[in-house]
Amino acid sequence: MAKVLATEIRVGNLIEWDKRIWRVLKCYHVHVGGRGGAFMQVEMKDIEAGTKTNQRIRTEDKVERAFVEPREMTFLYQEGDNYIFMDKENYEQLSLSRDFLEGQYEYLLPNTDVQVNFHNDRAIGVQLPASVVLTITDTEPNLKGATATSSYKPATTETGLVVMVPPFVLQGERIKVNTDSGEYIERM
């Protein structure tokens, strides 16, 4: 484990706090006037229990960064509420629940390459590619002449994800979607 200064904590980092592994959701610097000193306000989520907490850590304090072993895997298929991945190195299969994946399952198509992070041989998180290409299965038809405003319309993709798209995007077309924000990037 590596100790890092509180000022080096970044969103997405995994840190050990109170003998548990936490994922940093938000992190910002807070300066309290007078002799109060400076702090890092850190919002983090327990990766096992799913609980969230806010901690104020003095900037001069050090925290343990959790050792994470990344493994390249491929999403194979969905079986009920479980998603089956295959390790690219040893071809072992891993089943992860929909709850574990939270909102990430809406970006998964068969043969999508992902990085699964492990801590002490236990899966603790999935890192998706920066963007994915999905097919629109349902959206409102394009209204001719409705170009005066730059409005967006909802579109449902093949995975069930709802994305706001420009009016010119039609049902059956493929679009690129940002996996971090869920936003439309471009039509393919």
Curated annotation (Swiss-Prot):
Keywords: Cytoplasm, Elongation factor, Protein biosynthesis. Gene3D superfamilies: 2.30.30.30, Nucleic acid-binding proteins. One of its GO terms (biological process) is peptide biosynthetic process. Its main location: cytoplasm. Pathway: Protein biosynthesis; polypeptide chain elongation. GO terms for cellular component: cytoplasm. The keyword Cell inner membrane does not apply. GO terms for molecular function: translation elongation factor activity. SUPFAM superfamilies: Nucleic acid-binding proteins, Translation proteins SH3-like domain. It is found in: Cytoplasm. HAMAP family: EF_P. NCBIfam families: efp, PRK00529.1. Belongs to the elongation factor P family. This is Elongation factor P.
